Amino acid sequence: MRDPNSETSNFGNSFNAEDRRTITEPQTDWRVWQDGAVATQFVKERRGAILGGATQLEVMLELLPPRPPNLAPTWVLDLGCGDGVLLETILRHWTGANGVALDGSPTMLELALERLSIFHPSAVSFISEDINLPKWKDALPVLQFDAIVSGFCIHHLEDERKKALYAEIYDLLAPGGVFINIEHVASVTPHGEELFSRAYVRNIVRRKIERGEEGIFEDELTHFVNRLDASANRLTSVETQLQWLCTLGYTDVDCYWKHYELAVFAGYKKN
C-alpha cells in the first residue's frame, strides 16, 4: 500500500523543474479559464491549498490606504476577480465601499456573484471583460479607484501586455490609491520551481485527507504538473515587475510578502 504522503516514488524522484518547463510550453492562454470545469476545479480544490492564502489577505488589508476624507465614495476594482474573495475581504474591511468585480470567465463571475451577494446589490458591479484588450476600461462604472487589486490573474498575460496593463491601472488610481497584486511569479532557479510545486501539492494532499478523501502525493503531483491551465501561465519574476512599476511612476513599490513562487507586491499613486 502506498503512503499518501510519500514523495519517494519513481515519479517523485525523477520530477524536476526542467520537466515542468517542458510540459508547460505555451499551448493555451488565459481563455482556458473560460472552461467552467477548469475554473470550478481551481476554486473548489486548488484555491484553498494556496500557500499562505490567509496571510496574503492580511497583507493586502495592511497595504490599503486610509479611506477618503469627508465620507467621499470609496471604490475598489478587483481585476480577474475569480470567485470574489479579494473584493469580499476589502468590502468587509471598508464598510460601505463600492466594488467592481471584473473577469473574463463566466463561471468565475457566477461564483463571485454568489460570494458577493452578502452586499447590497448596488454596492458591487460585475463586468465580463478581457484585460488583454485596452478597451476593458470602457466598461467601468467609474474611472478612479482608491484600490485596485488582482489575485493570480495577470500572470496569464504576455510581458508586454502586463506592462501596458500596469500603466492602465496607474491611470485609474486616485491620488494616494494603491495597486496590490497577489500573484504567481517566476522562480529565479529551477530548484525554486520544484520546491513550489512540491509544497503546493503537499497542501492539496493534506486537504484531501482532512476531508476523508484519498490523497496520494505522486498522483497529485502528476495531475498538478499536467493540469490544463499550466500552459496558460506566463510567469515573470517579481523583481522585473517591481522595476516596471517604478518606471511607470508608482511609489513605495515593494514585494511585501513572498513564499516560493507566490508574492504580494504593490505600489501607490503619488498624492
Residue ranges, per PLM feature:
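Class I SAM-dependent methyltransferase SAM/SAH-binding core
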Residues: 75-79, 85-134
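Conserved beta-strand signature within the Rossmann-like core of class I S-adenosyl-L-methionine
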Residues: 176-183
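A short acidic, Gly/Pro-enriched loop at the edge of an enzyme's catalytic core
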Residues: 137-148
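A short SAM/SAH-binding and catalytic strip from SAM-dependent methyltransferases
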Residues: 146-160
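C-terminal alpha-helical "lid/dimerization" subdomain adjacent to the S-adenosyl-L-methionine
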Residues: 184-246
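Core SAM-dependent methyltransferase catalytic element
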Residues: 251-271
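Conserved class I S-adenosyl-L-methionine
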Residues: 7-71, 85-86
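A short glycine-rich, Lys/Arg-flanked "PGG" loop and its adjoining helix->strand segment in the class I
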Residues: 163-175
